[in-house]
Each structure stands twice: as structure tokens, then as C-alpha cells.
């Protein structure tokens, strides 16, 4: 009877049966055989020597189980003395082989973790043929498993009985060294993970570098703009409306240049008209340089150290130096000597009317002021009346009053003489003179006729007091 591998089962059974019977007869003679047989029967589940051993499949399963036990425990005793005869080579010999079955080479370590213990379907394929060759089924299974493990490291491999089982990555070879598939699989797994991590890190670094470069670029732009090295760039709409782009600073080009944060015209056509303040005169105009950098008008600081305030240049008032109250002094009503014939030519002027209190120690300054007032009045009256007192006037009584606004005139004709008088303001535009010879109040024209007509009478009354009316000085002060 032959199986698939060409083994003669009848020869094996006959050998096994004859050897079993022979060993059973010799068993009582050797006391050492009993513990070995018991040990072997307890470990391998074999029958006693008296029991018939006619089934070869049971022996093959026992041999496979014993081989697996020897792989897990290398110190376990071999079954060289399986039948209790240590001296003889008593082992089941298969197909004329000299070496017993127990001394045949074990299966390679690739079966660890893959070949189940209770594999009865493939027991005939696992039966040893010779001591130096592997079974064809074992080689085929090894190749299939090697290819499956190398192609799909994480796939599930099937065991010999058809059950699904998770196959590990590492593959053991005949010499006990681990194959390269484990390193390759681990390197691929680590490489894929490290590649993803590297991509994320590179993207994160790139974003951080971009942000840092943008911040540095904006900081450099701000620093350059503050130092005046870089000019801000404006678009067309922003330059026309005067809006600045965010992040740009207004550059100061020179020490005497101030940047304005709004759009102003390059030239100021004329002084502004202020409707709310009719007495408020406009100020000096602001000098503007033509727009150079994107329509930005820049004010230049002149020698007068003009300062640009926070509002447009057209609203900057100018200081009128000729104004009486421009330097903090309140306006005053000033008295003046006016004449009707000169009023339409020079206009109305306000002068001091002399209401300030006179001091005794300041007579010289008051006299000079009176002379100025007389000059203003004489310019209106003509050159016939001059300020001052005539040298031939004689004063009696309380004496002369040098602080009064004295005037003198010379009469025309053969009878003309020099007379003096004191002027005072009679009306708004009228001045009268009190003559010193008679004390008569008269107008400037009458005063001039009095100097021409009354010359003889004036000579006769030389001893008359110069001021017959003593209240003329008081009236003049009022």
C-alpha cells in the first residue's frame, strides 16, 4: 500500500508491529525501560508496548507533537531509546534509512507561530522522508508564506488548517537568523510616518518663516520710513483722496520739513475770507512745496520758524503787525486834531485825548506829548499857526503854564504882530484857541485875524495879565 509520497505503509506497519512485540518481550528483563516508556507515553500520548500500534497516522501525529516539544524545550530527552533499548539502534526505520526517525532533522524555525499543533489534515505531508531533504509540501508552504510576508507585511496569513491568523512581520530562516523583511517593513512604516511628520514640520516651519519674514519686512519698512530712507507708496485712489496706506509712515525728508497727514493744495491763491470774524485779519501764508511723493504736499519751514498746526493751511491765521491790539494791548480811543477841509483826504484818526493824570515831576514828557498833539492839529490848520509861545509874551499873576498846548501866530499886514494862545478841543472835529493877550476864545481863523487887526491895542495893553480867565487851563484839561 502506497501513499502520495511513495512510502510503503505495509512495511512500516510490519516493522512497527514486529519491533513492538520484540520490545514487549524484553521489557521485564530491563528495569530502566519502564520509566522511559512511561515518560514517553505521558509526553507523547503513545500506547504501551502491549497495545497494538497499527495506525501509522497516530505515530505521525505523535512524532510531530514530539518535534514541537523539542523545539520549545531543547533540554528534553530525545527519543533515541524510544523502545527502552539504549544500546541498540531501535527506532522505526523508514524506507531502508539507517538513521532512526527521532534523529532526523527538525523542521525549520519558520513553523513557530504558524503551524498549529493539532494539524491532522497535513500530517502525511509533514512525515519525514530522509535525513537531509525537506518535504515538497513544506518547501511550497515556506515559499508561499515568504512571498506573502514580503509582499503584504500586515496581511493575514492562513494556517495549514485554513483558519485565518495574524502573520507577524519577521520571518525566520533555516540558520536561525531573522530575514530582511522585518527591517524592510519597519523601515517602510517608519519612513512613511517620518515622511508625514517631516511634511508637517516643513509646512509649519515654512509658515513660521513666512510670518517671521513678513514681520521683519514690515519692521524694516517701518524703520526705513522713520529714518527717511524709504518713501511710502500710494495707489491712485488713495493719493487723490489723501488717505495713507496702513503700515507706512510719513517720511521726514529734512530737518526743516514737516509732513502733513492730509491733502492740501500746492499753492495758496490768496488770503482766506473769514465770515464769522470780520475784525480778524488773516495771517502770513504757508509755503508749500509741490507734491512729490504720490501727491503728498509737504510744508517747508522758513526762517520765521513757521509751525504747522493740526488743520489745513488755508485756516492758518496771519498776524497783522500794524494792528493796535495784535500784541496784547486793548484798543484805545485816541483823540486827534481834525479839520473840516482835510477830513475827506486823511480819514478819521483816533488819538489820545490827554485824559491821563498829569504828574508834577513829568512836566518835560507831558510838554513833548502836547507838542505832538499840536503838530497833529497844526497839520490840519495850515502853516500859519505854529506850536509854542511867542518870545514877547509877558505873563503876570501866577505865571506861565508850560504844560498847556501853546500855539503862536504872526499877523499879516503892516499892523501884524505875534500873539500866543492855548488850544483845546471844542467839538469832535473842531479846536478853539484862547488868546493870551485878551483871553478870548476864538477859532483858528479868528485867532489869525486877531493877530493882524488888534496890533495897536495889543501894544497898549502890554501890562494886562496873560490869562484874565484863570479857568482856561482847567477847561483845556477837560
From Swiss-Prot:
GO CC annotation terms, alphabetical:
nucleus
- Skewed-composition ranges (Basic and acidic residues): 23-35, 339-358
Record field: compositional bias (Polar residues):
169-179
Q: Where is this region: Disordered?
A: 1-247, 337-374, 454-478
Per UniProt, the keywords (alphabetical) are: Nucleus
Query: In terms of domain of life, where is this protein from?
Result: Eukaryota
What's one GO BP annotation on this UniProt entry?
Answer: jasmonic acid mediated signaling pathway
UniProt main location, coarse: nucleus
Q: Where is the composition biased (Low complexity)?
A: 233-242
- List localization entries: Nucleus
InterPro entries in the cross-refs: Ninja_fam, Ninja_motif, TDBD
Biased region (Acidic residues) positions are: 180-189
Family of this protein: Belongs to the Ninja family.
PANTHER family, sorted: AFP HOMOLOG 2
Tell me what this protein is called: Ninja-family protein 8
Amino acid at each position: 500500500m502506497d501513499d502520495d509520497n511513495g512510502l510503503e505503509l505495509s512495511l512500516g506497519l510490519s516493522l512497527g508491529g514486529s519491533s513492538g512485540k520484540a520490545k514487549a518481550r524484553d521489557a521485564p528483563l530491563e528495569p530502566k525501560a519502564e520509566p522511559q516508556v512511561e515518560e514517553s507515553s505521558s509526553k507523547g500520548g503513545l500506547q504501551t508496548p502491549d497495545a497494538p500500534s497499527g495506525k501509522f497516522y497516530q505515530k505521525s501525529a505523535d512524532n510531530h507533537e514530539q518535534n514541537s516539544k523539542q523545539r520549545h524545550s531543547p533540554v528534553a530527552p530525545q527519543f533515541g531509546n524510544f523502545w527502552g533499548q539504549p544500546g541498540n539502534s531501535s527506532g522505526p526505520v523508514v524506507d531502508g534509512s539507517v538513521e532512526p526517525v527521532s534523529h532526523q532533522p527538525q523542521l525549520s524555525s519558520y513553523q513557530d507561530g504558524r503551524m498549529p499543533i493539532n494539524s491532522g489534515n497535513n500530517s502525511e505531508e509533514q512525515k519525514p522522508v530522509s535525513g537531509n531533504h525537506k518535504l515538497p509540501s513544506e518547501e511550497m508552504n515556506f515559499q508561499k508564506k515568504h512571498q506573502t510576508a514580503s509582499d503584504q507585511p500586515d496581511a493575514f496569513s492562513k494556517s495549514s488548517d485554513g483558519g485565518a491568523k495574524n502573520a507577524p512581520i519577521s520571518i525566520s530562516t533555516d540558520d536561525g537568523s531573522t530575514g530582511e523583511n522585518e527591517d524592510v517593513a519597519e523601515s517602510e512604516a517608519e519612513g512613511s510616518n517620518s515622511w508625514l511628520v517631516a511634511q508637517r514640520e516643513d509646512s509649519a516651519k515654512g509658515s513660521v518663516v513666512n510670518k517671521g519674514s513678513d514681520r521683519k519686512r514690515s519692521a524694516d519698512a517701518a524703520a526705513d520710513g522713520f529714518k527717511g530712507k524709504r518713501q511710502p507708496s500710494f495707489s491712485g485712489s488713495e493719493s487723490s483722496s489723501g488717505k495713507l496706506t496702513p503700515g507706512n509712515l510719513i517720511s521726514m525728508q529734512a530737518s526743516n520739513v514737516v509732513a502733513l497727514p492730509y491733502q492740501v493744495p500746492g499753492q495758496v491763491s490768496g488770503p482766506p475770507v473769514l465770515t464769522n470774524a470780520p475784525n480778524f485779519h488773516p495771517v502770513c501764508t504757508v509755503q508749500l512745496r509741490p507734491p512729490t511723493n504720490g501727491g503728498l504736499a509737504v510744508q517747508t519751514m522758513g526762517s520765521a520758524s513757521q509751525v504747522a498746526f493740526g488743520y489745513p493751511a488755508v485756516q492758518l491765521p496771519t498776524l497783522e503787525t500794524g494792528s493796535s491790539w495784535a500784541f496784547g494791548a486793548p484798543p484805545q480811543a485816541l483823540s486827534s486834531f481834525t479839520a473840516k477841509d482835510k477830513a475827506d483826504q486823511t480819514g478819521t484818526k483816533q488819538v489820545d485825548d490827554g485824559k491821563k493824570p498829569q504828574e508834577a515831576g513829568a512836566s518835560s514828557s507831558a510838554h513833548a506829548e502836547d507838542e505832538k498833539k499840536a503838530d497833529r492839529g497844526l497839520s490840519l490848520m495850515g502853516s500859519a499857526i505854529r506850536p509854542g509861545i511867542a518870545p514877547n509874551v509877558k505873563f503876570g499873576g501866577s505865571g506861565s503854564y508850560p504844560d498847556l498846548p501853546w500855539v503862536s501866530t504872526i499877523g499879516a499886514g503892516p499892523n501884524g504882530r505875534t500873539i500866543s494862545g492855548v488850544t483845546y478841543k471844542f467839538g469832535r472835529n473842531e479846536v478853539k484857541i484862547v488868546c493870551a493877550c485878551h483871553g478870548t476864545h476864538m477859532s483858528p481863523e479868528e485867532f489869525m485875524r486877531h493877530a493882524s487887526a488888534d496890533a495897536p491895542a495889543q501894544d497898549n495893553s502890554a501890562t494886562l495879565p496873560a490869562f484874565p480867565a484863570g479857568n482856561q487851563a482847567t477847561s483845556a484839561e477837560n
